């Protein structure tokens, strides 16, 4: 039989290990992970677990987010097909966005495509420029993940940036029978899934780490982050299930995410 001191020591060691993989993994998600590994009797309820983190100075400070886009171009801007729409199955709606990543002496651009049903990252590309060919690489990865071919049931939603509206990108969507949807104003909530994905990667990982030294290090670390996010980190919007499990067929749970958490 273990003592309370031993129980707390084990819990803190597990928290430290998970925080090494995801430096800003929050208390609620840690509770889900540790309960799955150690059992509810050992870990205790969520509130007592959060209090344990607080006592041992393991709670995380809140971070502020940032964002960018350029829609001053001559290409056709498609209407928003996602207003009021909830994704009903994997590959129903894909949300695309580009965010910047600082490295020593430079900036890189992370192109992402997230599945709206499972919240899994299906495609990504880290590049040294905002050229559309880099954005298209993330799309190619997502199409491969979805099995390729005819994706006529899929809606691709993005902001109105030139990378998403240009002929190179639009033709790739049309070749795979993917419907095109774009935001109609500059409200971040019009592409909330993508904005939330950016925030998770930055707030839970990137902002907490030392600045990446170069492109190669950034690619390696971000690849590891996305793998952890997809396959290990519980996601509150799908009932604390793992995004890739839900993408591959597991039924999502109730949305547990609230802004005040």
Regions found by a protein language model. Give the residues of each.
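Basic, flexible linker segments flanking DNA-binding modules
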Residues: 1-90, 242-251
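RNase H-like two-metal-ion nuclease catalytic core shared by retroviral integrases
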Residues: 9, 69-73, 158-160, 166-170, ...
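Mobile genetic element proteins and their domesticated derivatives, centered on retroelements
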Residues: 10, 15, 30, 49, ...
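Short amphipathic alpha-helical interaction patches enriched in hydrophobic/aromatic residues
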Residues: 15-19, 34, 38, 125, ...
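Mobile-element integrase/transposase regions
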Residues: 47-112, 136-141, 145-146, 151-153, ...
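A short acidic/small-residue loop/turn micro-motif
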Residues: 115-116, 126-131
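Short small-residue beta-strand/loop micro-motif enriched in glycine and branched aliphatics
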Residues: 120-124, 181-183, 207-209
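C-terminal domain-tail junction helix/linker
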Residues: 174-178, 200-261
């Amino acid at each position: 039989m273990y003592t309370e001191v031993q129980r707390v020591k084990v819990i803190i060691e597990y928290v430290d290990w998970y925080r090494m993989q995801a430096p800003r993994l929050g208390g609620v998600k840690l509770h889900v992970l540790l309960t799955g590994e150690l059992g509810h009797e050992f870990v205790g309820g969520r509130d007592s677990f959060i209090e344990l983190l607080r006592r041992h100075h393991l709670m995380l400070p809140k971070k502020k987010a940032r964002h960018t886009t350029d829609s001053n171009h001559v290409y056709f801007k498609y209407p928003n097909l996602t207003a009021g729409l909830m994704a009903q199955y994997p590959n129903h709606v894909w949300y695309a966005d580009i965010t910047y990543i600082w490295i020593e002496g430079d900036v890189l651009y992370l192109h992402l495509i997230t599945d709206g049903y499972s919240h899994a990252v299906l495609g990504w590309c880290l590049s040294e420029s905002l050229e559309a060919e880099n954005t298209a690489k993330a799309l190619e990865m997502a199409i491969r993940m979805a099995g390729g071919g005819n994706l006529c049931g899929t809606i691709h939603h993005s902001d109105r940036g030139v990378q998403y509206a240009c002929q190179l990108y639009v033709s790739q969507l049309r070749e795979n029978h993917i419907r095109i949807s774009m935001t109609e104003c500059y409200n971040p909530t019009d592409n909330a899934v993508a904005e939330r994905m950016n925030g998770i990667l930055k707030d839970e990982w990137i902002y907490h780490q030392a600045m990446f030294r170069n492109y190669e290090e950034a690619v390696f670390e971000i690849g590891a982050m996305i793998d952890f996010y997809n396959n290990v980190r519980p996601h509150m919007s799908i009932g604390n299930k793992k995004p890739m499990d839900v993408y591959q067929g597991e039924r999502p749970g109730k949305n547990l995410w609230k802004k005040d958490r």
